Amino acid sequence: MSLNPRDVVIVDFGRTPMGRSKGGMHRNTRAEDMSAHLISKLLERNNKVDPAEVEDVIWGCVNQTLEQGWNIARMASLLTQIPHTSAAQTVSRLCGSSMSALHTAAQAIMTNNGDVFIIGGVEHMGHVSMMHGVDPNPHMSLHAAKASGMMGLTAEMLGKMHGITREQQDAFGLRSHQLAHKATLEGKFKDEIIPMQGYDENGFLKVFDYDETIRPDTTLESLAALKPAFNPKGGTVTAGTSSQITDGASCMIVMSAQRAQDLGIQPMAVIRSMAVAGVDPAIMGYGPVPATQKALKRAGLSIADIDFFELNEAFAAQALPVLKDLKVLDKMNEKVNLHGGAIALGHPFGCSGARISGTLLNVMKQNGGTFGVSTMCIGLGQGIATVFERV
């Protein structure tokens, strides 16, 4: 494949093991320490990359307060081998934050404003809860549906509009755990998980190289027994078909194709296009549809050209309508989230965009795909998507 000098390539990807937010492996690890460990280990793994060449560390994080405040990107960078002369910024696009970090780095490279970037994101939802310090504007209900900030209810709405049944959602949730467990047993996550020290359920320090969120004993019967989590009267969305609340971080080394060639590095993939899109906040989960369609148009590709998809599983009731309208629902078992998704692995907000993109690149590498799309919905009505081509 012939690459242009300013093409944007992904050199490597790593992530932490995903930890439960309640008493999980990361309960005694701060968000910036988790981030710094990941960045340091990924740079050690790629010793052709001089940390002094890093133009900017661009880190996604949603709830930027407490240990995640005061520009956590810089806080984490200062704890690594990256010199003080490199810059750092923290970005938030809610659920799409670290994919936005990737897009920001890509746009800088394309416009000759840097060659080497560290991107990724973190969310320690055990230490900084989802709603900590949040004060929504009371006048917002004059402009958007009152329940637009309640993601579970927006998923209920989207599922109802598209005729998604409770049984379909339970089957999707089961699939996520089964595929994530299978991927773990087969070593499919080995290249992406950077081992970290943490604490087990008995309080003993140990090294984790696996996700503690996956429930291999999940069954349709156990899922069917769960009560609706958001709408007690007639709701279909449960805890078992929603993304888990977890702690985690993800990281990528991104650079220009020219710099990768100069350093003798074989990239994982090149970015072919990027897009964001807005939708009605009341159906925020539908955002991946227009974002993906826009990204594919920019890449000159069609849905049929895409070998693999990673769609963030915010809710089964949200993911299924997206797959249906993207016309890949009938190809789901061959193309979509082959290593499970956020229902099994969790959705640490600032981490997830880079996480699903990196997992996609590993799926493509392991299965021989050429084109892949990572996409996700975003709270308050947005979608984001990236089209990759394997190099």
From Swiss-Prot:
Pathway: Lipid metabolism; fatty acid beta-oxidation. Its EC number is 2.3.1.16. Gene3D superfamilies: 3.40.47.10. The active site is at C95, H347, C377. The keyword Lipid metabolism applies. Its main location: cytoplasm. SUPFAM superfamilies: Thiolase-like. Keywords: Acyltransferase, Cytoplasm, Fatty acid metabolism, Lipid degradation, Lipid metabolism, Transferase. GO terms for cellular component: cytoplasm. It holds the Pfam family Thiolase_C. One of its GO terms (molecular function) is acetyl-CoA C-acyltransferase activity. It catalyses: an acyl-CoA + acetyl-CoA = a 3-oxoacyl-CoA + CoA. PROSITE patterns: THIOLASE_1, THIOLASE_2, THIOLASE_3. The keyword Cytoplasm applies. One of its GO terms (biological process) is fatty acid beta-oxidation. It is found in: Cytoplasm. InterPro entries: FadA (IPR012805), Thiolase (IPR002155), Thiolase-like (IPR016039), Thiolase-like_sf_Thiolase (IPR050215), Thiolase_acyl_enz_int_AS (IPR020615), Thiolase_AS (IPR020610), Thiolase_C (IPR020617), Thiolase_CS (IPR020613). Belongs to the thiolase-like superfamily. Thiolase family. NCBIfam families: AcCoA-C-Actrans, fadA, PRK08947.1. Heterotetramer of two alpha chains (FadB) and two beta chains (FadA). Catalyzes the final step of fatty acid oxidation in which acetyl-CoA is released and the CoA ester of a fatty acid two carbons shorter is formed. HAMAP family: FadA. This is 3-ketoacyl-CoA thiolase.
